[in-house]
């Protein structure tokens, strides 16, 4: 149950009954400190100002008609007109019982929407590098959360599989194939192959002429070029899939919807934009001038949709892409996990999409932008030699460092178990370090911090889970075989349940805002509440069996919530570390 939403509805009804205009915001939030209750209604002052009345007097009117029977044990007016709400112990215990009995932990399914999520999007014939990490794991965490809430999510891996560079790549692939027979699907060094192709193109005029010819042939559907192009895509995606599998990212080959998918739509779109009077000829190119964006001279900015030579641009593809996602995929929402530097480009494409009537305003187009991954020097994360860090190399190093960590913590474990634990911790550490930061900010990549057992890190959260799970091993009972009712006998129990009952609020916030750090913060706070409870409230040596069973139930609900929350982030838990 979303208790915040429940109370918000109740306060909204009371506001209206007290004379507020219909639809006035109740602005119910989780209280910052326990002395202000569990929730606080902050909307009274704004309404009182609107009505020209004293805020505290109006707050009292609201309280007089506020029905929180069976939910709150106390309400009070604080400061200039805040309403503090204290949840009743009986209500909390009842909600905790219901959550523990529910495989979904009390989280309701939402009314299903069709949501397209555009994330990862690496380029063909290039290896994935650290720059692809944020889009891939942030997008995947949000997708998992949306699916958990019951939405139909279509993953769209918008790979860069088209463009003039394919002429030189096909020409080089042909050369390699002629020299060494069949090209291996391993093609180990994609980056090397790309650099070699570029060098040949720049230095060998005969090769360059052939490459330019292959661009034209590929675009006109030549069978040989199409076959070579497909081989390049296959080789690249086989390598990318290894990274996805290692990272426990839910993308597969079936989710690939590359730039090439929209090729046939582009001439029709430009023709339609011309017919609507949106695209006009300017110096031989087709340009859409947008009043919403100004150039440095304060004039409407021109967005080119077709070059003078007849070629199309990324903007044209993005217009086609949005149109396809609405018309063919039936999207209610489209989420783009693309770095913040692309914001203006996307906004311009979407402005054209709306003006042309391709996607109605009722369909939400959302840019879930993210900042950069920086090194300790505050500059973009690079190798020591100043090169781009390959994603596979980063994951390899994470596994080596995690193995050293596990060896130092638990050397007596069997080798295969140590390796399995190290792999799980390594991938979790890389992902959680990113997911726990607000996605719009740049963040500093720091091995020592991400593998620490203190603070808001993956090892800390995974250890928090194993610590709770160990209670049941010591008790010799299963989490699913507990008797009696949850009874609150201590303030720390009440505080733990109140935090547990905020799980649905965290889940819904991640889904609504595309911000996985909300879940990380919630889980970290929950682990802290459990520690306080564990120290203050003995479980296995509780004063009587009823209290012991009740506290075991709270431990079970905590373990299940941490496990489910981490699962939504694409992170596995461990039974022991």
Curated annotation (Swiss-Prot):
InterPro entries for this protein: aa-tRNA-synth_I_CS (IPR001412), Arg-tRNA-ligase (IPR001278), Arg-tRNA-synth_N (IPR005148), Arg-tRNA-synth_N_sf (IPR036695), ArgRS_core (IPR035684), DALR_anticod-bd (IPR008909), Rossmann-like_a/b/a_fold (IPR014729), tRNAsynth_Ia_anticodon-bd (IPR009080)
Listed A to Z, the keywords are: Aminoacyl-tRNA synthetase, ATP-binding, Cytoplasm, Ligase, Nucleotide-binding, Protein biosynthesis
Where in or outside the cell is it found?
A: Cytoplasm
EC numbers for this chain? 6.1.1.19
- Which reactions is this enzyme annotated as catalysing? tRNA(Arg) + L-arginine + ATP = L-arginyl-tRNA(Arg) + AMP + diphosphate
Specify where it is mainly localized.
cytoplasm
**GO terms of molecular function:** arginine-tRNA ligase activity; ATP binding
Q: Which cysteines are joined by disulfide bonds?
A: none
Q: What processes in GO biological process is this protein linked to?
A: arginyl-tRNA aminoacylation
> What Gene3D superfamilies has UniProt attached to this entry?
Arginyl tRNA synthetase N-terminal domain, HUPs, Isoleucyl-tRNA Synthetase, Domain 1
Its Gene Ontology cellular component terms are: cytoplasm
- Domain of life, per UniProt, equals Bacteria
Q: Does the keyword Nucleotide-binding apply?
A: yes
Motif 'HIGH' region at which residues? 122-132
Q: Which family does it belong to?
A: Belongs to the class-I aminoacyl-tRNA synthetase family.
Q: How does it assemble?
A: Monomer.
For this entry, the protein name equals Arginine--tRNA ligase
Q: What is the lineage of its organism?
A: Bacteria, Pseudomonadati, Pseudomonadota, Gammaproteobacteria, Vibrionales
């Amino acid at each position: 149950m979303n208790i915040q939403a429940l109370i918000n509805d109740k306060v909204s009804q009371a506001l209206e009954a007290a004379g507020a205009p219909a639809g006035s915001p109740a602005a119910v939030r989780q209280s910052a400190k326990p002395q202000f209750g569990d929730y606080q209604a902050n909307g009274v002052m704004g309404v009182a100002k609107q009505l020209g009345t004293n805020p505290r007097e109006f707050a009292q009117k609201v309280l007089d008609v506020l029905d929180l029977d069976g939910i709150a044990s106390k309400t009070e007016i604080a400061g200039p007109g805040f309403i503090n709400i204290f949840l009743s112990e009986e209500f909390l215990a009842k909600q905790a019982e219901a959550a523990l009995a529910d495989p979904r932990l009390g989280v309701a399914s939402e009314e299903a929407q069709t949501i397209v999520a555009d994330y990862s999007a690496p380029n063909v014939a290039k290896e994935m590098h650290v720059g692809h990490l944020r889009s891939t794991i942030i997008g995947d965490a949000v997708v998992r959360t949306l699916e958990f809430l019951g939405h139909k999510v279509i993953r769209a891996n918008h790979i860069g599989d088209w463009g003039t560079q394919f002429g030189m790549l096909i020409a080089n692939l042909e050369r390699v194939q002629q020299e060494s027979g069949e090209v291996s699907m391993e093609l180990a060094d994609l980056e090397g192959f790309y650099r070699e192709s570029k060098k040949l193109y720049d230095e060998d005029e005969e090769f360059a002429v052939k490459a330019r010819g292959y661009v034209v042939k590929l675009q006109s559907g030549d069978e040989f070029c199409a076959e070579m192009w497909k081989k390049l895509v296959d080789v690249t995606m086989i390598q990318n899939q290894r990274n996805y599998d290692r990272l426990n990212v839910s993308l597969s080959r079936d989710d690939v919807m590359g730039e090439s998918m929209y090729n046939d739509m582009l001439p029709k779109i430009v023709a339609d934009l011309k017919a609507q009077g949106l695209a006009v000829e300017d110096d031989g190119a087709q340009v859409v001038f947008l009043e919403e964006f100004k150039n440095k001279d304060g004039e409407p900015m021109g967005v080119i949709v077709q070059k003078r030579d007849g070629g199309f641009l990324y903007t044209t593809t993005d217009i086609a892409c949005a149109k396809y996602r609405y018309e063919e995929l039936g999207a209610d929402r489209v989420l783009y996990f693309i770095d913040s530097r692309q914001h203006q480009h996307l906004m311009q494409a979407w402005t054209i999409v709306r003006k042309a009537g391709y996607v109605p305003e009722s369909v939400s187009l959302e840019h879930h932008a993210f900042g950069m991954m920086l090194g300790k020097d505050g500059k973009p994360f690079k190798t020591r030699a100043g090169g781009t860090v390959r994603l596979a190399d980063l994951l390899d190093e994470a596994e080596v460092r995690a193995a050293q960590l596990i060896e130092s913590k638990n050397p007596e474990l069997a080798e295969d178990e140590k390796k399995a634990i190290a792999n799980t911790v390594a991938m979790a550490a890389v992902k959680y370090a990113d997911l726990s930061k607000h996605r719009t900010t740049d963040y500093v990549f720091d091995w020592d911090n991400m593998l620490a057992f203190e603070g808001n890190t993956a090892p800390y959260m995974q250890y928090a889970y194993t610590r709770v799970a160990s209670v049941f091993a010591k008790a010799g009972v299963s989490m699913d075989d507990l008797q009696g009712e949850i009874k609150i006998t201590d303030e720390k129990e009440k505080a733990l349940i109140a935090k547990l009952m905020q799980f649905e609020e965290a889940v819904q916030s991640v889904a609504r805002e595309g911000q996985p750090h909300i879940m990380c913060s919630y889980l970290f706070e929950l682990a802290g509440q459990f520690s306080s409870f564990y120290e203050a409230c003995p479980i296995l040596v509780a004063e009587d069996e009823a209290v012991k069973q009740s506290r075991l139930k709270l431990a079970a609900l905590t373990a299940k919530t941490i496990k489910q929350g981490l699962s939504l982030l694409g992170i596995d838990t461990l039974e022991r570390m």
